[in-house]
Amino acid sequence: MPLDDRKKRILFAVVTDYIMTAEPIGSRTIAKKYNMGISSATIRNEMADLEEMGYLEQPHTSAGRIPSDKGYRFYVDTILQNFMKEDLSPPPRVREEVIAEFDEIVKKYAKILADITHHTTVAKMPKLNPDKIKRLQLIPVASNKMIMVVITDTGIVKNYLLNLCQSVDRNVFEFLNNLLNDKIAGKSEKAIFNFLEKELKDTLGDMAFMADELIKTILLSLKQLQETDVYTDGTLHILDFPEYKDLNKAKNFLSLLDNKSLLNEVLEPVDDFVDVKIGRENRFEEMRELSVIKTTYKINDRVVGTIGIIGPTRMDYRRLISELTLMTRELSNLLSSIYNDEV
């Protein structure tokens, strides 16, 4: 049964008040604070109907009511409908110096978002598959140390310090450096690993044994490109919420943030402008008392990662959606400006 306008206004008021106070709300509170133009008795009857319809819940013996996941969903959907119509300008406070390392830029924005919202933020770094490598270069820093610089087709730069037990002959090193760029750039993932694991030794011939350790180290580093990194910030903000004063509940939340494979799935990119999962809408049991607001960040309209906010279902969705959207838009603009020439 669809909600009429009066029920919608009452439900919106209940959710808004509960987000601010964390206390169950009664009909008299709604009548006094929100100028509904109807009696508290009428509001009480409407709230009883909303409870029967699954939008509100009555905790323990309290006379007041709190929103259910379904009630929060109505609230969020209403916000998102209005939000799409708003003209948002990026916040000037986050435009700072350019940082060369891609991951550090994303981490910095996740930290700023956590500081602004006082919530835990999570960011998914892009999975940089080897078939997206534009250039690979080895830079010697010592006889047994070198930096491997990987540049993707989007211009993202990844640096790896390679520590070797044995030094590599300079002639072998230069030959290998040129060979890698010639054979790897623009090739498919399968072709890259096939070359490194099988063909390279034949190509090197007598020099293969001198470069064996280096080749294995390069292979290991390239395989790390296939692993998605998840970064978290503001983890202790959860302790500021009354819902997490219970020590065991707080420990469970912190354990959840250590589960990178779960967070990796939670942060899978979505087609929606902003995706909000509330309580039991989350498919993981560990997330059933939490809400996740997430959106993607891009380089020149190409999705490269996801950034989100995790917290209790009682969160200020309107403010958090706004802050997340503004921050992600600014992050995308910065990344696009840095890597524009490389795409």
UniProtKB/Swiss-Prot annotation:
GO terms for molecular function: DNA binding. Transmembrane segments: none annotated. The keyword Transcription applies. Pfam families: HrcA. InterPro entries: GAF-like_dom_sf, HrcA, HrcA_C, WH-like_DNA-bd_sf, WH_DNA-bd_sf, WHTH_transcript_rep_HrcA_IDD. The keyword Manganese does not apply. NCBIfam families: hrcA (TIGR00331). Belongs to the HrcA family. Negative regulator of class I heat shock genes (grpE-dnaK-dnaJ and groELS operons). Prevents heat-shock induction of these operons. This is Heat-inducible transcription repressor HrcA. It comes from Caldanaerobacter subterraneus subsp. tengcongensis (strain DSM 15242 / JCM 11007 / NBRC 100824 / MB4) (Thermoanaerobacter tengcongensis).
